[in-house]
């Protein structure tokens, strides 16, 4: 009986993992994200159609997250006029939100707290940083739950730049 219970647990776990990853696929319409930004303004990913949007899940205690932010900011400043936007969603606990807000003051990203915004269509965010890139038509072009989680200039130039130029 114990052997069957263990097998059932393994199968159910595998199915749940597949459901999380199957929830969002490259080349498909990206699920909407909507709610309130840290500044209180409303946000809806659907309202940003026509722009390339980088959605970055991060936390104030995450060193790789903080290291990639200046790179993303520099790219945003260079390409905002071409239709590039960044939404940074902090995964911090409520006690750390003040620290996250302090960090966000250095950047021109749209920023939100995970408790104030609905991103359920992206499945369980199990690692940070996790970065998703959505093209001007609302199609997912980078899935932050797979591959290398790091955002650097090379990735931005390879994925985002062609999307901005329409190629």
Q: What do the predicted segments below correspond to?
A:
Residues 32-53:
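A short beta-strand-turn-helix
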Residues 6, 12-32:
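N-proximal helix/coil linker or "cap" segments that precede and/or mark the start of modular domains
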Residues 101-109, 114-159:
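Thiol/disulfide oxidoreductase modules built on the thioredoxin-like
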């Amino acid at each position: 009986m114990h052997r069957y219970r263990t097998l059932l647990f393994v199968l159910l776990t595998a199915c749940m993992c597949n459901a999380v990853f199957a929830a969002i696929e490259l080349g498909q319409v990206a699920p909407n994200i909507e709610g309130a930004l840290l500044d209180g303004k409303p946000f809806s990913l659907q309202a940003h159609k026509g722009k390339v949007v980088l959605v970055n899940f991060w936390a104030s205690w995450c060193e790789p997250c903080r290291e990639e932010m200046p790179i993303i900011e520099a790219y945003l400043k260079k390409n905002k006029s071409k239709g590039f936007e960044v939404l940074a969603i902090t995964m911090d606990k409520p006690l750390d939100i003040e620290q996250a807000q302090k960090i966000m003051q250095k950047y021109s990203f749209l920023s939100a707290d995970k408790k104030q915004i609905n991103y359920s269509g992206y499945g369980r965010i199990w690692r940070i940083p996790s970065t998703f890139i959505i093209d001007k038509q609302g199609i997912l072009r980078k899935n932050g739950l797979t591959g290398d989680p790091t955002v650097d200039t090379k990735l931005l130039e390879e994925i985002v730049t062609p999307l901005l130029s329409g190629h």
